[in-house]
């Protein structure tokens, strides 16, 4: 299964360069090992997608709860995905 997510330019570039192999996401969607995460570069300054796309296979999943990235209400309801990619 393919799962599409937008990614900001700095994080997209790190992933493209192979310097970033994990991705932290609010766990409000279905995903499993073997799925393909389709990262679509999104520029928050322009409010639009750049057209660059990167596909990565999900190698490992760990669901955790963190309060540094999302509202406590959202974290309590969903948790987070820590997604390791190949």
Residues of each region from the PLM?
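A structural micro-motif recognizing beta-strand termini
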Residues: 25-28, 86
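Short coil-to-beta-strand transition motifs
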Residues: 48-57
């Amino acid at each position: 299964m393919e799962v599409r997510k937008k990614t900001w330019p700095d994080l997209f570039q790190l992933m493209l360069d192979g310097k970033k192999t994990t991705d932290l996401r609010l766990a409000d969607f279905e995903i499993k090992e073997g799925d393909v995460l389709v990262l679509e570069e999104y520029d928050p300054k322009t409010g639009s997608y750049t057209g660059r796309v990167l596909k990565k296979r999900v190698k490992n999943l760990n669901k955790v709860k963190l309060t540094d990235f999302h509202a406590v209400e959202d974290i309590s309801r969903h948790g987070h995905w820590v997604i390791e990619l190949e």
